[in-house]
Amino acid sequence: MARVKRGTIARARHKKVLKQAKGYYGARSRVYRVAVQAVTKAGQYAYRDRRQRKRQFRQLWIARINAAARQNGMSYSRFINGLKKASVEIDRKILADIAVHDKAAFSALVEAAKGALA
């Protein structure tokens, strides 16, 4: 059996990890053993937060819609229920955008929701 020297492979792997850890503080960006842990943990956080980002944006949209709906004298849940009954199919992302940038259009939507509930 021939002897296998792994220097090139190991160096390449070390370089890859240290490149990923570039910008980290202290030993996390310089020492391979510490950098591996830091990069692994960063990957776990990234994986988790890609899923959490979707939840957080939905929470933000709902908070904005709720605030705008209450300014027009209606709660969030009644507003959404009214829109469904009025068969207005606008998602929360667009509703939040309208609430922030176009108050008149949002007021019209609130009136439509009130009309459907009455």
From Swiss-Prot:
Domain of life: Bacteria
Glycosyltransferase among keywords: no
Molecular-function GO terms, alphabetical: rRNA binding; structural constituent of ribosome
Cross-referenced Pfam families: Ribosomal_L20
Gene Ontology CC entries for this record: ribonucleoprotein complex; ribosome
GO annotation terms (biological process): ribosomal large subunit assembly; translation
Keywords noted in UniProt: Ribonucleoprotein, Ribosomal protein, RNA-binding, rRNA-binding
NCBIfam families hit by this protein: rplT_bact
Function: Binds directly to 23S ribosomal RNA and is necessary for the in vitro assembly process of the 50S ribosomal subunit. It is not involved in the protein synthesizing functions of that subunit.
Homology family: Belongs to the bacterial ribosomal protein bL20 family.
Protein name, per record: Large ribosomal subunit protein bL20
Underlying gene: rplT
